[in-house]
Amino acid sequence: MSIAKIAGVVLGSAALVAGHGYVSGAVVDGQYYSGYDMSYHYMSDPPKVIGWSTDATDLGFVDGSSYADADIICHKNAKNGAISAEIAAGKQVELQWTDWPESHKGPVITYLANCNGDCATVDKTQLEFFKIDEKGLISGSDNTWASDNLISSNNSWTVTIPSSIAAGNYVMRHEIIALHSAGNKDGAQNYPQCLNFKVTGGGSDKPEGTLGTALYKDTDPGILVNIYQTLSSYTIPGPALYSGSSSGSSSGSSGSSSAAPSATASASASATAAPVQTSTATAYQTSTAVASVTVTGSSPAQTHVQATSSSAAASTPTASSGASSGSGSSSSSSDLTDYFNSLSADELLNVIKQTLSWLVTDKIHARDISA
């Protein structure tokens, strides 16, 4: 077996074990709201939370073959969140993900849709989403993406609710699009997450939106793209950013968002203050301050988030797992083969050792919200 095949098997297995992520909760004005924990799927009477439920218990994705189907809206067979988190227009919400694999690089995008009534009963296929936040390629020279910023910010992302939108009930659609297999048609992996918010105050804007089933096409330049080449720019998928969105509203490690649908590579920024472990939910701000927060929900999500790993394997192109669409095509296989064959035996062994160490010994809980 060739070096490339051996490395592909090892790193592909690592991707399967590491899994993907989902939004476990949100922090608003110092208060923690549980999202939909995957363990709730097996409960006869799960807690009422702001996060929409989903059948994606394998932490899987939606690919381009389902862009016209309802699953792309809020994930597979998603059902409405039962309650809403109240937030004033102009305020920030911190969205907390479970551990996200570094190999799954791509943009982070956030939308809102006015429910025009109760979000607990709204028909998701009728929701019209307008984009309030986006970030894509950070640096083409070292292949740094918005997802890397999210990881370095303790797997969290902060979004500002536009101050100009009208008060009302909104569904937030927050999403990472993983591009590690996107060199192949339908290889991009969408991980949409939906949460309910009651927006207070604000202005009078009621932005026009786009149905969730019309947000993307599988041939969009930001969807069908080879990220294993040096990119000088990247076009973020989806409709244009809402004009009332705050510039710099999002925060991975840099705390800025692109101001147009097309994002151009810029210098990578440093990470925020290092996270700490507590027995309660913790809001990680983009400054040195770390604030304790209270927990809302009949049962807090029993989710733990992995601290950023130093694994070299996670930052290199990995062989797609069995869940990845189009992983066997010649395009991505050639890219991976060239990369692995360029490594010396010692370098390859080091990549494998660090991957196994990350999987077995280095996993720690960066947040504990199960107090």
UniProtKB/Swiss-Prot annotation:
Glycan-carrying positions: 154
Disulfide bond annotation, renumbered to this chain: 74-194, 115-119
GO biological process, one term: cellulose catabolic process
Region (Disordered): 304-332
Cofactor, how bound (note): Binds 1 copper ion per subunit.
An example Gene Ontology molecular-function term: metal ion binding
Signal peptide feature range: 1-25
Gene3D superfamilies linked to this entry: 2.70.50.70
Principal subcellular localization: secreted
Keywords: Carbohydrate metabolism, Cellulose degradation, Copper, Disulfide bond, Glycoprotein, Metal-binding, Monooxygenase, Oxidoreductase, Polysaccharide degradation, Secreted, Signal
Residue sites binding Cu(2+) per the record: 20, 104, 191
Keyword Disulfide bond among UniProt keywords: yes
Record's subcellular location: Secreted
PANTHER family per UniProt: ENDO-BETA-1,4-GLUCANASE D, PUTATIVE (AFU_ORTHOLOGUE AFUA_1G12560)-RELATED
Protein name in the entry: AA9 family lytic polysaccharide monooxygenase B
